[in-house]
Amino acid sequence: MKQLFRQWYDLSEIKKELTTRNWFPATSGNISIKVSHEPLTFLITASGKDKTKTTPDDFLLVDHLGVPVLETELRPSAETILHTHIYNNTNAGCVLHVHTTDNNVITNLYSDAVTLQNQEIIKALDIWEEDATIHIPIIENHAHIPTLGENFRKHIQGDSGAVLIRNHGITVWGRDSFDAKKRLEAYEFLFQFHIKLLSIQGGVSNGANSYS
């Protein structure tokens, strides 16, 4: 029980911080944190809640299938399946899914992936090579959640990572809440920098890659 309370507090603090950045517009987004490994349980945001508010109903505890462990009227977020795929296939401890203008714009500029390189902040992703290059996959935003989940699952390759969903935000996971938040911040910085650089250079009309 102590672990549950500790993880609840940790997730609540992350929610507050990401809210101050307006990364949960119009109740969008969902976040989760692992509570136990055997059996697998994790806390996840309840569906349709205003994440700018802090209430006792912010999160609910679910199992490895995303089913509530305790009797509740709350519903887990619609994309809970993405979280279950991550927790069932990795040792990740926290998953963050947010919608920002920048990460949505990026998915409209590129088709299957966005490549970013030669930025110092890439080291926040535990990549230490000089002039490092990263590739972030982009998948289609299927309304059929099981299809979305299956396409997403194909890109889960370790205990930390990220996947962009076209016009539907980014999902980032890490070893724990600190690692996941650090990675999310790094990706959002890279997206913002990339878009600003394109605008200075003339954008897609002057040769930058585009997807439509």
Curated annotation (Swiss-Prot):
Pathway: Amino-acid biosynthesis; L-methionine biosynthesis via salvage pathway; L-methionine from S-methyl-5-thio-alpha-D-ribose 1-phosphate: step 2/6. The keyword Metal-binding applies. SMART domains: Aldolase_II. Its EC number is 4.2.1.109. Gene3D superfamilies: Class II aldolase/adducin N-terminal domain (3.40.225.10). Binds 1 zinc ion per subunit. GO terms for biological process: L-methionine salvage from methylthioadenosine. It catalyses: 5-(methylsulfanyl)-D-ribulose 1-phosphate = 5-methylsulfanyl-2,3-dioxopentyl phosphate + H2O. Keywords: Amino-acid biosynthesis, Lyase, Metal-binding, Methionine biosynthesis, Zinc. One of its GO terms (molecular function) is methylthioribulose 1-phosphate dehydratase activity. Signal peptide: none annotated. GO terms for cellular component: cytoplasm. Its cofactor is Zn(2+). Catalyzes the dehydration of methylthioribulose-1-phosphate (MTRu-1-P) into 2,3-diketo-5-methylthiopentyl-1-phosphate (DK-MTP-1-P). Belongs to the aldolase class II family. MtnB subfamily. Homotetramer. This is Methylthioribulose-1-phosphate dehydratase. It comes from Bacillus cereus (strain AH187).
